[in-house]
Amino acid sequence: MEKTLTIDGKMIKFKCTGGTLMRYRNQFNSEFLADFSALGAAQKDPAKLNFASIENMIWAFAKTADPTIPDPQTWYDSFDEIDIFEVWGELSELVSKAVKTLTKNAGRAANQAAN
């Protein structure tokens, strides 16, 4: 699953694969699916919104599409303007499909391990 967006006049590719979860965990020492689930809960209570998780997920999708992207701080500093919520909104379909696929695969793996 891939998507290209224009951010600050630059074409940026975003991609989600099975490796995205590992990349996210290794970079941020946090579980992607748990953080994504917490974002869903924040819809009911915006005070619980973890803005850093959104930034981290966006970076992980970009890094998956382009391994040459630098660390998150350097990458975000490369933009004069970036609307995180606009980017997140544009990536919502990619994120939804990815999470559906990942949770489906995780469920299958758990069932196979139990048998």
Regions found by a protein language model. Name each.
Residues 1-11, 30-52, 64-115:
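Charged interaction scaffolds used for protein-protein
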Residues 18-28:
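N-terminal first-folded block
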Residues 14-16:
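Short capping micro-motif at the N-terminus of alpha-helices
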